Amino acid sequence: MKRQKRIALVNDITGFGRCSVTVELPLISAMKIQACPLPTAILSVHTGFPNHYLDDYTARMEPYIKSWEVNGLAFDGICTGFLGSAEQIAIVLDFIHRFKGAETRVMVDPVMGDYGKLYPSYTQEMCDKMRRLLGVADLVTPNLTEACQLLDIPYPEDGIVTDGVLQQMAEALAARGPQQVVITGLHEGDFIKNFLYDAGHMAIVRAPKIGGDRSGSGDAFAAIVAASLINGEGLEEAVQKAASFISRCLQYALELDLPWNYGLPFEEYLTELH
């Protein structure tokens, strides 16, 4: 009997600011896949606002997972986003071991930092545990900062690396577990570049730079790539689809003069995503 595909989303739920699950769920649903949130926290707005309310969900994650297990749920994909503590990473590792079937794809977006710096909440223990998460991943989508941290190598002073170095980094990340690696958000003149490694094959997907940084862009990218892969598309096609969709949203955000922390106005183009 035919069954609709499902992806478990391990991420926070944020009420305003278009990030994490509130971006991932509608995008994945538009691509005809059931999105099933496993919340790590509930926030009123993301931390890019002057004030936010946060309800840490760590203590509730295990009984939540246990209920899924007792009910016999299974997933075609598991996507992980921002994890707020070493304990949460350990819980997610256990969740993957319990729910990763023979055909389940695990996609890890290691949200750790940017522009050469870790986020303030990130500890050395969290970095070590995130490296362990690589060992159970099929796909990992770090930016340059995160790739350097995962490999324990220095971040380049100007944030620029050659394609040869990117290839070495992608191969080194793949050697730790994932067959597929996308090093995201690389600056190259008037373009943003994504460097792809797919079981030995390399490719580059570029998109024009449009505006500045915008909350939730990484979540949107990860969601579209994940859903595309679960739908049977290749990695390069998936990344191109994500980059093109996000470019349209960024352009529309400029037209609306939308503050960066309001995220991507993806709703305008949601019905065109498939």
What residue ranges belong to the model's regions?
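Conserved phosphate/ATP/ADP-binding segment of small-molecule kinases
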Residues: 120-202
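Short, small-residue alpha-helix embedded
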Residues: 149, 212-235, 239
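Conserved N-terminal subdomain of the carbohydrate kinase-like
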Residues: 2-108, 112-120, 271
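Short pre-catalytic strand/loop immediately N-terminal to key active-site residues, enriched for Gly-Thr
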Residues: 15, 202-216
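Charged C-terminal helix
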Residues: 236-274
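A non-catalytic, amphipathic alpha-helix used as a structural packing/dimerization or gating element
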Residues: 60-63, 132, 168, 237-245
